[in-house]
Amino acid sequence: MFGKVSSLLVFASFLIIQGAFATLVAPIGDLEHLSEIELLYTNRVLPSKIPLTPFVKRDDDSSSTQASYSTTVSDVVIVTDKSWSDGVETIFPYSYTEYQPSTTYTSAPAGSIGYAASIPNTGRELMESGSPVRFSKSSLLIVSLLSIAAFAALVL
């Protein structure tokens, strides 16, 4: 009896972790047409579309390859990667995601930054990722399969 209860607890924890990953990853809209997309935050649509300008430059920008520009709408983070080519600065939208006030998760690569409100409708704080963190649909599928395999191994 105890073995079955513990296996159910393990399976439930796998499902919780999988669900957490799924909620953290959900890009909104089409990255090809950023200016035409309205961003969603919880159950409401933000009143404005994604602004492509103005971009905010970091004061401590010293690297020519480090992402140092970002723009936000309310609690939504839009991260951009910056690169230099022949002395000309080029800004590429990399990704954007709903900001989760309880976490510092970002889908941006290492060195990318974004500004976001730590609490809705308050001041903004700097978020910077220290390492690449990406969860794709395929990685979620792997987590799902591992969950099922672990459950089957514990129950059988």
Swiss-Prot record:
It is a lipid-anchor; GPI-anchor. It comes from Schizosaccharomyces pombe (strain 972 / ATCC 24843) (Fission yeast). Residues 130-156 form a propeptide. Residues 1-22 form the signal peptide. Keywords: Cell membrane, Glycoprotein, GPI-anchor, Lipoprotein, Membrane, Signal. It comes from the Eukaryota. It is found in: Cell membrane. The keyword Signal applies. A lipid is attached at residue 129 (GPI-anchor amidated serine). This is Uncharacterized protein C24B10.06. GO terms for cellular component: endoplasmic reticulum; external side of plasma membrane.
